[in-house]
Amino acid sequence: MAENSESLGTVPEHERILQEIESTDTACVGPTLRSVYDDQPNAHKKFMEKLDACIRNHDKEIEKMCNFHHQGFVDAITELLKVRTDAEKLKVQVTDTNRRFQDAGKEVIVHTEDIIRCRIQQRNITTVVEKLQLCLPVLEMYSKLKEQMSAKRYYSALKTMEQLENVYFPWVSQYRFCQLMIENLPKLREDIKEISMSDLKDFLESIRKHSDKIGETAMKQAQHQKTFSVSLQKQNKMKFGKNMYINRDRIPEERNETVLKHSLEEEDENEEEILTVQDLVDFSPVYRCLHIYSVLGDEETFENYYRKQRKKQARLVLQPQSNMHETVDGYRRYFTQIVGFFVVEDHILHVTQGLVTRAYTDELWNMALSKIIAVLRAHSSYCTDPDLVLELKNLTVIFADTLQGYGFPVNRLFDLLFEIRDQYNETLLKKWAGVFRDIFEEDNYSPIPVVNEEEYKIVISKFPFQDPDLEKQSFPKKFPMSQSVPHIYIQVKEFIYASLKFSESLHRSSTEIDDMLRKSTNLLLTRTLSSCLLNLIRKPHIGLTELVQIIINTTHLEQACKYLEDFITNITNISQETVHTTRLYGLSTFKDARHAAEGEIYTKLNQKIDEFVQLADYDWTMSEPDGRASGYLMDLINFLRSIFQVFTHLPGKVAQTACMSACQHLSTSLMQMLLDSELKQISMGAVQQFNLDVIQCELFASSEPVPGFQGDTLQLAFIDLRQLLDLFMVWDWSTYLADYGQPASKYLRVNPNTALTLLEKMKDTSKKNNIFAQFRKNDRDKQKLIETVVKQLRSLVNGMSQHM
């Protein structure tokens, strides 16, 4: 039962395998047959049996089919045999036809091959044309690039390169020539950069050389504009009758208008001739280089290089020549180069974007301004010529106005000019010191004579002198001052004009200018003129007459100071009543000069007295006096009388002081003559002769040589001599010794030491020359009295020494 069940199960499987074998390709039968052996043992036998049964079935079907079609096959063979002959004939015909076709086809093949070859050529030509049409624009653009490079149109060349790279090269990137072009473009760009940089360097060198010309042109233009504006202002002021500008020459209004018209016409012509910076410099290299580097994307490198090089040039421009201070051309060249530099930078600032910024120019200008101020401060200190300093100021003002017109701040320059103004005043003071010295050297120190009205008016026009008494006098007459006074007055006004020249165009108010003029004038008066006067007064060749005239001159110059103040007021239109207005110090200046002159008069007078006294030739051993005063003393008194007559033009106190000083000095000199240590002996006759001379001095003092003394004030100058001589002449020692130290003493002014010195000289004389022989013979008691007096005088002297 079990075996039957197994056999039943394998039959369908074998049928499946048979179906699979029948329907499967023979190459795949192996796995199917293997499955037969992989099944149950002996299954293949059953499969073989099943296979044999299947084969037998198929053989039967084939046999049936053959039997069914056999008659038809026989009929077909019969028909085929019938057409066999026709087939042979057809074969022959076909062979012949084929031969003929082959023969004819050979020519067709040849023509066909030609046609194919032509077609290929045509296709290739078409392809080439298409490719050439694609490449030609590239080649044309590259050729254009080469032409632009040759023509130095580098910016256009860079634009062409951009087009080639962005538009044309992608079309033909597969071709070798395109690769070569692509590889060559960076080199061309570098060449353009180098060429552009070379052009920029040439440009920088060119503007460095032309900076002075550029600056000169810009400064001329600024100066012309300023002059034109000033001319218009003058015209408006004249039109409205406001003469705000005081000129030293009074030109009629019609002449002013004519001159102004010509001036304006000249300014118009000059403005037409002035070139601009674009006319003087070709800026195209900068533009090209900037555009090229912008296109190349390296604009920052270009900007850094340009600014670095320009800073180097700025340092070179700001470095002055060592001898710049010697001539105005040195300063002018320095200024024009700086102006040229910054005019170029300003132009670059306004025509380019980013290459030069306002912050960069401001930084550069601040650096330059500090250097300029330091240079001008240093070099101007070497200037000793006021005209050169004034030229420097004018150049600096034009320089500042020019750069201010380009937007650069210049206030510090005007502050510097304010400093230089002090130096300018110093140079003016030195110059005017020479002028004053020349005036004093040329003066004859005598009153100015005038013989007619014309000469009188000439003097009045030069110096503001008013004296009704002098006006009433008939010609010829004399002004009290000498010729130097109007000359000094004129030169002081000239100094004010010169000082005003520097103050103009400094952008200062009228009040400041007024203050500056007054201060500088005060310096001229208190320092320069005062110093010149003092030096003049102390000169050895200046005599008493000249000193008297100098005192008179200073008096009139002092009175003229108020006119100088009015003169400054007319220039500045600042009233003297203004709170902060500086006053002129002429009063103290001329007072000091007068005091110095007075002191010099006293000194000179004393020196003259000393000269006369040195002529004294006393015989100190004479036994009897001559009976008349010494000749030298009479000459001295006559000299003093004549001198004091000249002093009548001096203020009373000056003459009185001089007279008192002279008498006191004469008294002192005579006293010193008596007490001279080299004088060892003196006789009573010499004392009597000396007394005659002192009497003449007292008579001179009592004659009132100078009015104004009260009583015998002048005689008191000789009181010491008088009491001493009276003591010896009267021989009143008992009274002297008894009253010594009493306020009411008759010989109060006689010093014991002085009396002792003179008495010892007389004592020695008596011993050597026997002057007192009669006393020794007739009255030895008197000799003892002398010795007693000497002892008492020594006792008084010693007592005084101990008390002191």
Swiss-Prot record:
GO cellular-component term (any): exocyst
Pfam families recorded: EXOC6_Sec15_N, Sec15_C
Protein family according to the UniProt entry: Belongs to the SEC15 family.
Gene: EXOC6
Keyword Nucleotide-binding: no
Primary location: cytoplasm
GO terms, biological process: exocytosis; Golgi to plasma membrane transport; intracellular protein transport; membrane fission; mitotic cytokinesis; vesicle docking involved in exocytosis; vesicle tethering involved in exocytosis
Organism of provenance: Homo sapiens
Keyword Protein transport in record: yes
Disulfide-bonded cysteines: none
Subunit structure: The exocyst complex is composed of EXOC1, EXOC2, EXOC3, EXOC4, EXOC5, EXOC6, EXOC7 and EXOC8. Interacts with CNTRL. Interacts with RAB11A in a GTP-dependent manner.
Keywords per UniProt: Cell projection, Cytoplasm, Exocytosis, Protein transport, Transport
Function: Component of the exocyst complex involved in the docking of exocytic vesicles with fusion sites on the plasma membrane. Together with RAB11A, RAB3IP, RAB8A, PARD3, PRKCI, ANXA2, CDC42 and DNMBP promotes transcytosis of PODXL to the apical membrane initiation sites (AMIS), apical surface formation and lumenogenesis.
InterPro entries: EXOC6/Sec15, EXOC6/Sec15_C, EXOC6/Sec15_C_dom1, EXOC6_Sec15_N, EXOC6PINT-1/Sec15/Tip20_C_dom2
Subcellular localization: Cytoplasm; Cytoplasm, Perinuclear region; Cell projection, Growth cone; Midbody, Midbody ring
Residues making up the signal peptide according to the UniProt record: none
Name used for this protein in its record: Exocyst complex component 6
